[in-house]
Curated annotation (Swiss-Prot):
Its EC number is 4.1.1.23. The lineage of its organism: Archaea, Methanobacteriati, Methanobacteriota, Thermococci, Thermococcales. This is Orotidine 5'-phosphate decarboxylase. Keywords: Decarboxylase, Lyase, Pyrimidine biosynthesis. It comes from Thermococcus kodakarensis (strain ATCC BAA-918 / JCM 12380 / KOD1) (Pyrococcus kodakaraensis (strain KOD1)). Pathway: Pyrimidine metabolism; UMP biosynthesis via de novo pathway; UMP from orotate: step 2/2. It holds the Pfam family OMPdecase. One of its GO terms (cellular component) is cytosol. The active site is at residue 63. Substrate binds at residues 11, 33, 61-70, 113, 166-176, 189-190. Belongs to the OMP decarboxylase family. Type 1 subfamily. One of its GO terms (molecular function) is orotidine-5'-phosphate decarboxylase activity. It comes from the Archaea.
Length: 213
């Protein structure tokens, strides 16, 4: 079985449901992304439990956006819980991002997938790409809802920095389009965990991606 490029955004509250969905879809995933809903609903220990159940990397999508000391305090506990990667905002500046990177692998938001991102984030995307190129994080977040923006970001980003793209499915993006535009990984949430058959939904997306890589 070829390595997956699919990341499950497990945006649910309930611990048992989260573990059940993670276990049944794990064969088709590269990683699982946890966000505030699951951490608030189930506690930080859910990161440890998901790793135990699936053996997959865990991305903590906290979008850290605070002063360096606060970012450092949060990241320390999240990495201790077993997270492999943390997502942080770049717009708060180099020092705040470096505080997270000192502790573990970091993914920087350079552009988001929702319509409102065009108001304040997209106008500074070039600056955020420059920051990423200088700091060399594991990866950056770019919008699968706008493949042309993924292509734009890829063309200006150092090749060793991965692109992870949310917005596939419920937000309107297509997995294969994101990959063809230059994404390394595709992040999907509701189209998998909201499906009547999450495993089958994950399998279909896994195969869609494989057709274009």
């Amino acid at each position: 079985m070829e390595e997956s490029r699919l990341i499950l955004a497990l945006d649910v509250y309930d611990r048992e449901r989260a573990l059940e969905i993670a276990e049944c879809t794990a064969d088709y995933l590269w990683a699982i992304k946890v966000n505030w809903p699951l951490i608030i609903g189930s506690g930080l220990k859910i990161i440890t439990e998901l790793k135990q159940v699936t053996g997959l990397p865990i991305i903590a999508d906290l979008k850290l956006a605070d002063i360096p000391n606060t970012n450092r305090l949060i990241a320390s506990k999240v990495f201790e819980a077993g997270a492999d990667y943390i997502i942080a905002h770049g717009f708060v500046g180099r020092d705040s991002v470096e505080a997270v990177m000192e502790l573990g692998k970091t993914i920087i938001v350079v552009e988001m997938s929702h319509p409102g991102a065009k108001e304040f984030i997209q106008p500074v995307t070039d600056k955020l790409i420059e920051l990423a190129n200088e700091l060399e994080p594991f990866g950056v977040i770019a919008p699968a809802t706008r493949p042309e923006r993924v292509s734009y970001i890829r063309s200006r980003l150092e090749r060793g920095i991965r692109i992870l793209t949310p917005g596939v499915g419920a937000q309107g993006g297509k997995a294969s389009d994101a990959i063809k535009a230059g994404a390394d990984y595709v992040i999907v949430g509701r189209s998998i965990y909201g499906s009547n058959n999450p495993r089958e939904a994950a399998r279909r997306l896994y195969e869609e991606i494989l057709e274009v890589v």
